[in-house]
């Protein structure tokens, strides 16, 4: 047989393999010798003819475990994973003596689909039973299978049990973490690998660089680049392109340009990476110049290049250049039917306002490319062209183009943004009729109903979802919290916590806001404790905690959270200023404002609003005037809220004439909040003459603010101005405005009970009045002791 081995190696075509096969048949070697049979099986598969491999295998009367392994391996080569697994089952049914050579190929077949993970688990069991689980190749194959099917915990168990962890094992685990979106874990594993003395190769470094790009952390990116430089890797085009993309995704375009310049032989991938980097940084003109240089250098662009260039044209409105690029693609027959570039073309025409051209593209690809439809619907929705977005949705249905989950979710979001909830309900009906159970769609429905105030409808959708992800739970949690259903939000969080459901930063953010809105201090502290244990604490949750503690009356806790923050955003500074303001600590509020400015953070409208509010709470008129005038120095123009707060400060101090003069000098018409501040000051200082003097100004106000109408009508009632009282109440009634009833809330053992006037819930009232009775008794006892 040895004389035939060079012949197998020299077979460079399917025809030559067939000729050798015929010769072996004539000589009779295929009937008794398994070696040429296995070589033929491999050769046919290598030439892309797995069916011929199968025929050779079936013709041999006594295939052994090794021959099965060869055919299984060949099926995996040819991506015939089901066939490979079927062969394995057949082998298991025929013999218990399975060669360890079989297992790596079967495990690779199982790695190709999550559906085959259960088979992979059984194969793993047989490997352990057969005592071959210490084989390095098998261990790496197990690692690969669990990693590729998303079962990272089992992959780590296999890895931890390996007596020797070589480069392949480490690289497989790092790649598995990256493929499953666990970028931080992948980088941690890479560090452990280096610390363990295992030298990474170029392939591993490319994976790590791509992970850094996804993470977007420049500090880590530079550290990895330094590792590459120290190890003196050969900076080939692939590694350079990865580094280039990494730096652009981390916001360091200058480093991307430096790496690009170092590439000696720039290919289409290099140029495309640089063009995409410019696009990512919104340097569209540089992207177009790079494309021009690429063409001049004789490098043929690919579809990815053209897609990036079209995006550049769209960003700066160069429609003529965009059409030229598309014409270039058509002339080179790169995209004859708009198939690949349809999405970029739709975005280009939409950005340039050529909506008729968008729809022309849609007509060309309508039967084939639902992505283009979705793109235009999404673009219309984001640009506020909600009617057009919904018109496209209707057009799709009319043309019998089946909307997918993205289409439905985008259309539902469009209805939400336009306040067209009835139309959103119709789409909801379509979702029910077509039995769409996609999580993205269901979450959009919860969001739409929640933001329109229909919390009951949102809750109904939520309760009908069988499998809820953390996003779904968060959508409902935020829905309750944003609509004032804070008790329900806290109850939902408790259920999540005690059911050991997955939580993330958004979960904690929503429940902290719920605790804040009803002043539930004990529950807020408990949530804070659980947040620390979970390791999910971040800038946003810290800022929410500051607000929560301040509103619940624990300023010391708010200060503790603020001081412990490693970094502070403008929202964090603003929240702390607001916290001091709520507690009348004007000196601390101003000191924090000054610290913020010294740290290099420029104050915005919200910061000044909180400073003015702090001045208002403490009655600090002179400070209020100073900071109101200071706004212009920082390029901030006072809006209606700033004026309302400043007028309130002046009015409460009794300086009503100055307040009125300020209103008249406003650069825009004063709204109900501004006039309401002046009216409230007049009520406090019993200046009905001023209210009568500004009666015409007040009657011109049209608003849906029930507080404004209630304040003014109550003043008229106190003064016996019944005609004006009736006029205002009539205006409220005709506008269908109702005063939102107030409520009280009390916290007992971390449980919050809410009640309003006329509350008849006996379970709550009994507990609440029992607690209040105890407080009354304590008060009476203290009074007796004092006397």
UniProtKB/Swiss-Prot annotation:
Keywords: Mitochondrion, Repeat, Transit peptide. PANTHER family: DYW DOMAIN-CONTAINING PROTEIN, OS07G0578800 PROTEIN-RELATED. Belongs to the PPR family. PCMP-E subfamily. InterPro entries: E_motif (IPR046848), Pentatricopeptide_rpt (IPR002885), PPR_At4g14850-like_plant (IPR046960), TPR-like_helical_dom_sf (IPR011990). The gene is PCMP-E66. Residues 1-16 form a transit peptide. It holds the Pfam family E_motif. This is Putative pentatricopeptide repeat-containing protein At1g69350, mitochondrial. PPR repeats lie at residues 33-63, 64-98, 99-134, 135-165, 166-200, 201-235, 236-266, 267-301, 302-336, 338-368, 369-403, 404-434, 438-468, 469-503, 504-534, 538-568, 569-603, 604-638, 639-669. GO terms for molecular function: RNA binding. Gene3D superfamilies: Tetratricopeptide repeat domain. It comes from Arabidopsis thaliana. Residues 750-780 are annotated as: Type E(+) motif.
């Amino acid at each position: 047989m040895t004389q035939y081995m060079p012949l197998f190696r020299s077979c460079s075509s399917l025809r030559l393999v067939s000729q050798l096969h015929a010769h072996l048949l004539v000589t009779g070697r295929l009937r008794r010798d398994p070696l040429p049979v296995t070589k033929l099986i491999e050769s046919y598969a290598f030439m892309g003819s797995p069916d011929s491999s199968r025929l050779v295998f079936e013709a041999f009367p006594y295939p052994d475990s090794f021959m099965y392994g060869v055919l299984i391996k060949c099926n995996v080569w040819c991506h015939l994973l089901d066939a490979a697994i079927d062969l394995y089952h057949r082998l298991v049914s025929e013999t218990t003596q399975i060669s360890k050579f079989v297992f790596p190929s079967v495990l690779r077949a199982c790695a190709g689909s999550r559906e085959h993970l259960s088979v992979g688990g059984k194969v793993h069991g047989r490997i352990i039973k057969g005592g071959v689980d210490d084989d390095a190749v098998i261990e790496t194959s197990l690692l690969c299978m669990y990693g590729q099917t998303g079962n990272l915990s089992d992959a780590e168990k296999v890895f931890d049990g390996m007596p020797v962890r070589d480069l392949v094992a480490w690289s497989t685990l790092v790649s598995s973490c990256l493929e499953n979106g666990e970028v931080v874990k992948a980088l941690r594993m890479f560090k452990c690998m280096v610390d363990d003395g295992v030298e990474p190769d170029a392939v591993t470094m490319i994976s790590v660089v791509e992970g850094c790009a996804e993470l977007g952390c420049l500090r880590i990116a530079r550290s990895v680049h330094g590792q590459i430089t120290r190890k003196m890797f050969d900076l080939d085009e692939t590694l350079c392109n990865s580094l280039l993309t990494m730096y652009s995704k981390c916001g360091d375009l200058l480093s991307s340009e430096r790496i690009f310049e170092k590439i000696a032989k720039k290919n289409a991938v290099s140029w495309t990476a640089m063009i995409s980097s410019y696009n990512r940084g919104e340097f569209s003109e540089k992207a177009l110049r790079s494309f021009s240089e690429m063409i001049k250098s004789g490098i043929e662009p690919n579809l990815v290049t053209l897609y990036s260039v079209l995006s550049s044209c769209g960003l700066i409105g160069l429609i003529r250049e965009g059409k030229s690029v598309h014409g270039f693609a058509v002339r080179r027959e790169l995209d004859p039917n708009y198939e690949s570039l349809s999405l970029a073309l739709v975005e280009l025409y939409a950005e340039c306002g050529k909506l008729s051209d968008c729809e022309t593209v849609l007509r060309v690809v309508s039967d084939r490319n639902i992505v283009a439809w979705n793109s235009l619907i999404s673009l219309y929705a984001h640009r506020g062209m909600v009617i057009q977005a919904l018109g496209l949705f209707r057009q799709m249905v009319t043309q019998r183009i089946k909307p997918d989950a993205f289409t439905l979710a985008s259309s539902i979001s469009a209805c939400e943004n336009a306040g067209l909830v009835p139309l959103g309900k119709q789409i909801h009906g379509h979702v029910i009729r077509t039995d769409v159970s996609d999580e993205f769609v269901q979450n959009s429905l919860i969001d739409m109903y929640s933001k329109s105030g229909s919390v009951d409808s949102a809750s109904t959708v939520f309760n009908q979802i069988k499998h809820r992800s953390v996003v779904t739970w968060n959508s409902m949690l935020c829905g309750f919290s944003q609509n004032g259903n804070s008790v329900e939000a806290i109850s939902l969080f408790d259920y999540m916590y005690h059911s050991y459901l997955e939580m993330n930063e958004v979960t904690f953010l929503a429940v902290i806001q719920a605790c804040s809105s009803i002043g539930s201090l004990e529950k807020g502290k408990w949530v804070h404790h659980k947040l620390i244990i979970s390791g999910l604490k971040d800038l946003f949750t810290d800022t929410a905690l500051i607000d929560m503690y301040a509103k619940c009356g624990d300023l010391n806790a708010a200060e503790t959270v603020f001081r412990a923050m490693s970094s502070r955003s403008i929202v964090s500074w603003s929240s702390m200023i607001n916290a001091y303001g709520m507690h009348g600590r004007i000196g601390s509020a101003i000191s924090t404002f000054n610290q913020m400015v010294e740290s290099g953070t420029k104050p915005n409208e919200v910061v000044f609003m909180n400073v003015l509010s702090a001045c208002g709470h403490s009655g600090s008129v002179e400070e209020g005037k100073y900071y109101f005038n200071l706004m212009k120095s920082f390029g901030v123009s006072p809006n209606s809220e700033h004026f309302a707060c400043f007028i309130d400060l002046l009015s409460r101090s009794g300086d009503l004439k100055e307040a009125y003069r300020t209103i008249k000098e406003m650069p825009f018409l004063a709204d109900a909040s501004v006039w309401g501040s002046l009216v409230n000051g007049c009520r406090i200082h019993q200046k009905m003459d001023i209210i009568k003097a500004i009666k015409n100004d007040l009657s011109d106000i049209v608003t849906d603010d029930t507080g404004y109408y209630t304040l003014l009508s109550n003043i008229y009632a106190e003064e016996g101005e019944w005609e004006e009282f009736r006029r205002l109440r009539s205006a409220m009634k005709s506008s269908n405005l109702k005063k939102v009833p107030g409520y009280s809330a009390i916290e007992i053992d971390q449980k919050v009970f809410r009640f309003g006037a006329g509350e008849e819930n006996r379970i709550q009232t009994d507990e609440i009045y029992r607690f209040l009775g105890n407080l009354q008794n304590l008060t009476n006892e203290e009074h007796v002791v004092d006397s």
